[in-house]
Amino acid sequence: MTNERHDELACLGIFPLKNPKQLDGVVTPILQLRVKFLAPTDRWWEGLVINKDLSKEESEELWKFLQSFDPRSAKFVGRGTPEDHVISYLFEAGKYEFEVFFYQKDHSLKLMGLYDKTQKQLLRRDSSGDLTSTDKERDVSPVSHSEKPYWDRYDLDQPSNQDVEESRNLVQEPKHRSKKYDRLGLDELVMEQTASLWKICSRNGMSVDEFLRFIRMGLESNFQHSNQVIPTHF
């Protein structure tokens, strides 16, 4: 391994992973938010995987992997420039890919997150034009359907044009609407909007603590006229 490659792997020195405190200061703010607030408290490590919601078995498998993962075994697979003054490095280990961000302005390295490689392959295959729609449904479903963005899933659940034409009335509730899809879709929507908002705030010098404080203030103002109570510890 070259010295340059060793430097790129520096923030992976947090592994093997034993507790969430090891993530302090070495992950991106968005990943920190995912681990602290989006993942279940007793399965916080699930927040590290950003392209898939894990089953109980997959969560246990990931935890065992993270506890024994040696970053020196990671294989470098590529780099990119997701935004100005940021270089992205991608490493592969086991069934996961690790993305590391190098911020050129302050020369800091942050772990962006993990990707489930199998899920990436399914999504890539689903979006390619090599297969017919019938082949896609047979080979990829139902996983591809559950991983589609919220609004795409919503459209798939709507009545067909023929149904609408025959009844002349829109169906108020989709026939096959799943509460699970709705929840996951809203999770994605909140995460996407939060990420965009944080990017703007961080570029203007706002810290993570300030960002979270303003989010809390926004929630409190919304709860003023509600019988719901906002948690005391956000």
From Swiss-Prot:
Subcellular localization(s) per the UniProt record: Cytoplasm
One of the protein's GO biological processes: meiotic cell cycle
Name by which UniProt lists this protein: Meiotically up-regulated gene 35 protein
Keyword Transmembrane: no
Keywords: Cytoplasm, Meiosis, Phosphoprotein
Sites of Phosphoserine modification: S127, S128, S141
Modified residues (Phosphothreonine): T132
Stretches the record annotates as Disordered: 126-176
Biased composition (Basic and acidic residues): 126-156
Biological function: Has a role in meiosis.
A cellular component term, taken from the record's GO annotations: cytosol
Gene designation per UniProt: mug35
